[in-house]
Amino acid sequence: MEVLMAERADLVFRNKVIDGTAIKRLISRLIDHFGMAYTSHILDQVKTLGFRQATATSISLGIDDLLTIPSKGWLVQDAEQQRLILEKHHHYGNVHAVEKLRQSIEIWYATSEYLRQEMNPNFRMTDPFNPVHMMSFSGARGNASQVHQLVGMRGLMSDPQGQMIDLPIQSNLREGLSLTEYIISCYGARKGVVDTAVRTSDAGYLTRRLVEVVQHIVVRRTDCGTIQGISVSPPNGMMPERIFIQTLIGRVLADYIYIGSRCIAVRNQDIGIGLVNRFITFQTQPISIRTPFTCKSTSWICRLCYGRSPTHGDLVELGEAVGIIAGQSIGEPGTQLTLRTFHTGGVFTGGTAEHVRAPSNGKIKFNEDLVHPTRTRHGHPAFLCSIDLYVTIESEDIIHNVTIPPKSFILVQNDQYVESEQVIAEIRAGTYTFHFKERVRKHIYSDSEGEMHWSTDVYHAPDFTYSNVHLLPKTSHLWILSGGSYKSSVVPFSIHKDQDQTNVYFLSAAKGKARNSFSVNNDQDQGKHKFFTSGLSGKKESGIPDYSEFNRILDTDHSNLIFPSILHKDSDLFLLAKRRRNRFIIPFQWIQEREKELWPRSSISIEIPINGIFRKNSILAYFDDLQYRRKGSGITKYGAIGLHSILKKEDLIEYGGVKEFKPKYQTKVDQFFFIPEEVHILPESFSIMVRNNSIIGVDTRITLNTRSRVGGLVRVEKKNKRIELKIFSGDIHFPVEMDKIFRHSGILIPPGRVKKEFKESKKWKNWIYVQSITPTKKKYFVLVRPVIIYEIADGINLETLFPQDPLQEKDNLELRVVNYILYGNGKPILGISGTCIQLVRTCLVLNWDQGNKSSSSEETHASFVEVSTRDLIRDFLRINLVKSHISYIRKRNDPLGSVLISDNRSDRTNPFYSIYSKEKIRQLLKENQGTIHTLLNRSKESQSLIILSSSNCFEMGPFNDVKHYNVIKESIKRDPLIPIRNSLGPLGTACQVANFYYILKTHNQISVTKNLQLENLKQTFQVLKYYLMDENGRIYNSDPCSNILFNPFNLNWHFLHHNYCEKKSTIISLGQFFFENVCITKHGPHLKSGQVIIVQIDSVVIRSAKSYLATPGATVHGHYGEILSEGDTLVTFIYEKSRSGDITQGLPKVEQVLEVRSIDSISMNLEKRVEGWNERITRILGIPWGFLIGAELTIVQSRISLVNKIQKVYRSQGVQIHNRHIEIIVRQITSKVLVSEDGMSNVFLPGELIGLFRAERTGRALKEAICYQAILLGITKASLNTQSFISEASFQETARVLAKAALRGRIDWLKGLKENVVLGGMIPVGTGFKGLVHRSKQHNNIPLETKKKNLFECEMRDILFHHKELFDFCISTNIHDTSEHLFLGFNDS
């Protein structure tokens, strides 16, 4: 160093390593001391010295110089271990995907950082003269991050969207990468290549637009005479000192600064480093500085408002083109930094948090009232303290006190024993970082097909009551219960045992409203019973509560299922909207011969309402007559005979998107028509061999393996991912007149009628159906289709149905036979292959006479009674007209309905006691109750019905396990209301009316072990489904529009020990959800998670399920109980994370701020704030002042916040740009106002954009108010709204700009640079500026007071002084980057 100076004697010798930043500091100090020329001489000597030394050392770099860090192996192993534990937690549903991602990123980031810190000490100890170490740590070439990738580990990378990939690259480049790691690490390289191409042009265009806005801004004066300033308060906790210094250095003071009475700085003095240090030491009041914002010149800027020139540190020269410098300074980092796309991780919020560790072993104590439980952002349980918390740790000999700051997490429980150095609390990082936080949505997709359940109530999104977007109010689990929509028409196996209760959805019958009361039948008069006997060997029935209100998302008034049924009764026609209801169907096995003669193969089904209550005129039983059964698909039509009768008599109504015919007139339907058609439903991928609107013959090949059964016209339609191919048989006719087609479309024509509209007149023998077809290109034609007529016969005589005796007891009970059509008028009916369609159903309608006052009730109770004779069971239907004496209303928390068992009631009160004695009932236990019901598939077009029954008889046997029997007896004594959860049977089975238990031993019981074997049932099963119950014991009624199929391999059978029964009810309850590895039995943990759906005496059936954790504020998609297929979105989490570090993500932000676009939903809506300010100020201050001050205040506010926004982007990239550059740009895009009213039509047009100062000056000159409001222009708009049309035309939209300028007769004063360049004149900057200095000599000599004698001017100044406090407050805090606290809605996106 001695070489540097001549006078060596008084030199100070500093023995210190100098890196890049130190060199920068040295150079700036040298310039300050010695000036430019001497400094360059010194630096030349330093350069020569450096090169000489480097040559002498002759460093070379070989692959052996890359030394890996020895501790890496166990660090990676440790991280792997943590990750495995995390995986397990996620699998068991303890943490959700976002928490898992966050934590795994943090684990790997910490590992990577630790390796990076080890790197330098490792080199220093092992090989201090290692070339890699010397190069990178001296700052000559390469940085710590690059060396870390060479010898540590590459760590976490981000994908092209800037999201982290949670699979880290564990190898470093010295060891070599595996294939996966190589592909992941190529993301960065590819991104670099793409960015270089794409983003460079973006940055260039940004620079061009910026320069365009400010190209005319030149320093043209020394002082504009402004008295305004922007105040900066001295550094406090909020604003780092560094930023305070950067803000002040090089500015000019706008006011005198006093300490006490002593003035330490004068107005218009420029601020150097010495003055700033004095400000910091004295902690003065806010300092008022001049900025480009405060300059009063309209289209240029003065020296004092600009301040020092950054190049030489003196006041800026006159004629300097500061606008262009500003535009380029903002655009340049963009072009440079696009090439810098290294991701070094650090993508989670706030870095790793600080930890508080226990000072010694001992018991920890704190006040539990001051903390409340919460989850950390990794999903771990913790306590959050809102104020300072004092924690004491008592060890044997000493008590430690630790204070934990507010907003920290306490990770241990009260009175817990902690070890020394154990982490007891986590302090949230309170330091302010310049990271961009953005809100990210993370979608979680379901892994398997199944049915969705959740274990808490959810909120609906307020705008859409019926939408499937629900917000979670608290942390809960979502379960996907296995099972999917059916693929085939036969279920592989049944888990129901013989004689389980069946529950069937039947869609096309009419039902009244859901009733909420559940009654226990009590009857005073035993003689009044109706026994309705027949050879039932089917089901036991009882009043079953209607669970439909537990379907928490049931939309009562928004039912989209309409199945109109026509009840042919007393010539009345009803349109019965089908509600979602369940029904019990019992098939009769006909034993008497004469009934077999009547209906050889049809079965009668009895239905009992869910709650056991019949209304008047309700349907008791029905049977399907074979003569109304059809094999193929088709359409039904009915109505009075006549040419246009059908269109006249019915109105087409739209209901929930389904077109229905609503009859207006009451007609008696005595015949209806069936128009057959052949329908094939094929997947989208099938190739079809026939064309739409073509005509084919019988047995034509349609697809590879299907042939048509009839000939006719082919229609092909695509509906929700399926192809619907219909073949209409019939003749084709070409009509004479076009307009008559549409009138005759879709009508029935009786036989013998001649139609003149067709070219060939012809009489038809049978009924025909006329339908017009519109092909794509050819002419229209009409299709005449054959029709099948069905007459509806009169009711069947009742005597054939029932034995004589019961009906002869006169008890005002009537049974009437009614036929009704199952399908609506004009509704297409789709037949599934191999099944038949029933067109007409015959029903028994139950009615009773109201004449008898004693029994004139609106409803009646029905229940099934079983009588056992010689070990055979007979079922009777008992209809009970007397109102019950006790009826319970169900509570919401008691979904099972109240069930009464009473010891002290007489035998007369309960009809069942006449059949079984009380002791007998107590002894019997029902082993299995079960429900099966059917559903429609989603398209609501095909129907399926299950009736599970078996014709074998059973014996009744006593129950042999005494232990269990005692438990039941005890519980009956203790609590007469036995809840469903502890009872046996499949999930969702309801209790009996008189809650008696009995065992049924069937002769051919399905063995549980051979669970794939299915008894030969007479019906083919289509869909199998259960009631499902959630964790709260609420049974919910599933949606009939969906269907689900159990895969037998998804059900896990769990066998219980025999001696296990007594404790079973406490451990396993029906409907309970299990997580994986929960112990159910003594044999060890259960291996899969699931829900218990069947509890039997010796075994439990568990339906496998997958749990997903969701936290509050997450959005759940889909309805409760909806069937989701694999890959459907389940939940959306919204979480915050900081942006990954590269400017390419920052550049678009800068552009959006400068173009004043709203960034997205979380945007800083500056424009809205501007409007708000405008309105409020005008209201407060009245018209003339309001406009002026409103515009001023608004502009000041928005300017400062814009500057902060832009600075934030660049600072987060570590790029230093002086504020004044940004200020010049922002000044241009905020300096225009919009003329709002045409009060001043002779000066400005409404909607015209003018400069704020021009508006003020015009207002002063005309002495009347101009109405205007502040407006924010983007940089593109600002470039197209300048004073020079030549400059605008050279930027964009040349023809439009020039045409407009010509029409308006605009004059261009050629004040800017660009106009002069275009026209080849002298540019008015630098040396060219000197020729322009003309009129300002005597202008500057006029004293300030005479200039300001205008009254308006003085008052305006006063007002601005009054409001200065407000500015000071807003502005000072704003410069400290707290705009988000001040202005709501300014979230950083």
Curated annotation (Swiss-Prot):
Transmembrane segments: none
Signal peptide residue numbers: none
Protein's GO biological process: DNA-templated transcription
Superkingdom of origin organism: Eukaryota
Quaternary structure (record): In plastids the minimal PEP RNA polymerase catalytic core is composed of four subunits: alpha, beta, beta', and beta''. When a (nuclear-encoded) sigma factor is associated with the core the holoenzyme is formed, which can initiate transcription.
Its biological purpose: DNA-dependent RNA polymerase catalyzes the transcription of DNA into RNA using the four ribonucleoside triphosphates as substrates.
Protein name: DNA-directed RNA polymerase subunit beta''
Source species: Morus indica
